[in-house]
Amino acid sequence: MDIPTVPRQITVHLGAPNANAENITLPFNEYIKNVASSEIYPTWPKEAIIANILAQISFTLNRIYTEYYRSRGYDFDITSTTQYDHAFKKNGEIFSNISQTVDEIFNNYIVRDGNIEPLFAQFCDGVRTRCNGLSQWGSVELANSGMTALEILKSYYGDNISLVTDAPVGENIPSYPGTPLSRGDFGEEVYRIKIQLNRIGKNYPAIPEIPYTNAAFDAPTEEAVKTFQRIFNLTPDGIVGKSTWYKIKEIYAGVKQLSELTGEGLTISEAQRVYPRALVPGTAAEAVR
């Protein structure tokens, strides 16, 4: 998993995940404007509006970063139903002050100190429903008492959070490399798979530990992949095709609790690219040590 970026576009499913509903793709900032205009009121104090929008951005980026839906076989990034995600209304009204605020902060998001994934910033209205995250109406009271947006967020998510500001914007590219990985392959993707399988193995000890976490798809890697595939009812061929790739990603995100408010999280060292380019036989030895 790479360092997070803010996608230029997002695909929204207009219904529950399994519902036969339309998918629409739109610019990320336009999506957040729609969500914010559907979830909160433009008459709220500015700091409450900012706090709520930051929570909405962070929640959305967490869904995209973990490929929560795509790793489960869906062809969208998020749904439009509050049972699973945010409120979103196709062609919904956008309030001007909310639109302006989103344009100012759409590439800012919340992180837990020491972690790099966007916080799974749950929220609820605080009146009809309650949750462990931000209370929308409660944020209004806190803003009226003089709190800043960050102070409001810390009051709900804990003091050990901070904001990433001016995050890079890029394309929303699926993580699957496009071709299956198998014994004899080299590269960053192989390295990531080995790291992830070793972490998954702490929760599923039947998966043998891979002793050398470098960029080579070797025999121990193949055996670990086969065991993983058996556990999760995939064809145990030792090849990391699309279904195995995304199942590994799904289970890794689960054991790391990346889509929970208080999870293990992902450190920057776990997300940095170790091998900046694809490796092929004959690559200089320094790059594969």
Q: Language-model segments: what does each one mean?
A:
Residues 1-289:
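Conserved, single-site charged/polar hotspot
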